[in-house]
Amino acid sequence: MVTTPLHSSPKSSLKSSTTSLRSVHTQSGRMGPSEPKHRTTKSWSIWGGNDEEEPELSNKNKGKETAQDNSQENDNVSNEGTRLHDNQQTTILKETTRIEKGEKDKKDRNAAIVEKNTRPRAWPFFWGRNKKDPEPTHNIPTDADNNTLSRLANSLNPAPLTNTYIPYKPDAILIRDKGVKTAKKLTDDIGNQFPNIVVPSFDILPKQTIWNTVTSTIWKWKTEYWDRRPSSRVREGEEQVQHSQNQLKEETNTVANEAKDEERLEHNRGSLFRVDPWKKINLLSDYQSRPIRVLIVGVHGFFPTKIIRPFIGEPTGTSTKFVTEAEEIVKEYFDQHKVPIEISKIALEREGEIFDRVDFFYEVMKHWSKEINNSDFIYFVSHSQGCPVTIMLLAKLIKNGIINLDNSQFFNDEIQFCSSKKIISVLAMAGINNGPFYGADQTLFVRAYQTIEKDSLRELFEFQKFDSKQSQSFIEGLRTIISNNVKITFVGSINDQLVPLYSSTCLFANHPNIFRAIFIDRGSQTPAFITRIVKIAGSLLNLGYNDHGIIKEISGSLAGTLTGGGHSTIYNEKQVYHLGIKFALETTDLSEMYPIEYSPYKLSELGANPYRLPWCMRGLMYESNKHFSNEEIKMLFKEFEEWEPETKQLKDIKNRLNGLKYRL
């Protein structure tokens, strides 16, 4: 009986299995009954395979195999051949899997090496570089200029997140990519941003005309003449008039003079005029001969400890957040006018007490004095406690000569010549300029929190005292920066749970270089009547007139809930950042700077007398009829009649103003 050769099935299996191994050649010998335990030996590597080939039996030897008559031996040989066939297939599959995995790993490593050498890296700004990432390599051109090398150095060594100067780069890292920006825009179209309002609008300021220019000049001459006149008491002493009739006339003149002084003071306080932005854009860009260099500085506010954050919310208002939002609005503003700009950023971050923060930020800014002085437009954006910090910091920088406002008078090899002065704008959002709500330090919640963070929280209430060290430094800072033509935009939140409107809008200081606005979130559900009141009052204040203290009286009743978010939603509104830019670039400058006017008041008396609010409303309506159209008062009456307050505080306001029903 002739035994069937066992090499046919293993050979066909080897042929089909080894086709996937391009770099490996496997040869299998014939398995005879005399060598049942023989196996092929292989050695593998990730670069290929080396076979130790067994000598193949010649066909001549194959033909010499003889048949055996024993059927039991045939069965044993067949079973042994089947087992060898299965073992070979299993071995080949394992070897194939290992080879394919090795080749894949090799390709991945090669691709990573190529990518490392060729692909430029752009590190994310918010988190920095991952420690697991390989160091980037770049081909630095030998003929590159200084600007190219500087930008390349910035890409190789990205600047830290905070307390450093982030220079301009064409692919600005703070701007969101197109995908994220588009998603944000869609969210705005259906979300809470567009319905939000900021009152009063910038358009409340009068537009500059020939008539109001001449009128302002006449009033200026009249004021100068009035100031040169000797006082009535001096004239009386010179004339030595002593009888009672002259004394009575003197008293009458005193009352008349006080009324005239108030009228003259209101006109002197006045307001700036709206002008075309191209007037200042041309000056900043040397008549469009170069890009405008813009520097944005962000200063965050008070950060509570983690224990208290579940009650008042997480502190999302970081300096980086403000700088990012402001940069986007600045780009949009200048893109509308098709003006090239170069934006640099400094995000100042440090927690602690106010004076410690001012000193620390001063050292940071002093280190970048050259870059700061090469800027044409400097935009400070601040929030909460960061507002007084920003004003004190800017005043210190100007006093000590770190910021030079006029590069046409002082310039050198490092500081470039500029034909115009710098324009500096300060945006103060929900600033604690006059402290938190009066009496909040006596609440159980705040008293319990003072045990955790005593000094940082206690000094916020020091701003409620006009004779405190913090308030005096703040007032001195205001005087310094306004005398150097810095323009300040105070914006308060209607339902702020921490800062009242009279504090966030800084009502104790008056000057044409100050613009006040109130942010009204759609989620606050502010009644139309309250919105109308703050709009009229804000318009009067921005035009240099008197609101008769109505904002001070109603501020206490507008406090939001502790978790309402009014204090932390203001810095998400684009209109707020846009307002700070427009007030700086689209208004006139005073021909002659005069000091800021301070009007201190007692916070303990605000809202204490229920009869004061109707009197304030009477004065507000009088001023509105005098300076605005009658439509505002008509709408005020209509909205008051339709108003149905829900909270106890708002019901109290309506009860005290019931005289409006009878047009009293």
Swiss-Prot record:
Residues 68-94 have a biased composition (Polar residues). InterPro entries: AB_hydrolase_fold (IPR029058). Residues 57-67, 95-110, 231-241, 248-262 have a biased composition (Basic and acidic residues). Residues 1-146, 231-262 are annotated as: Disordered. It comes from the Eukaryota. Transmembrane segments: none annotated. Disulfide bonds: none annotated. Present with 377 molecules/cell in log phase SD medium. This is Uncharacterized protein YML020W. It comes from Saccharomyces cerevisiae (strain ATCC 204508 / S288c) (Baker's yeast).
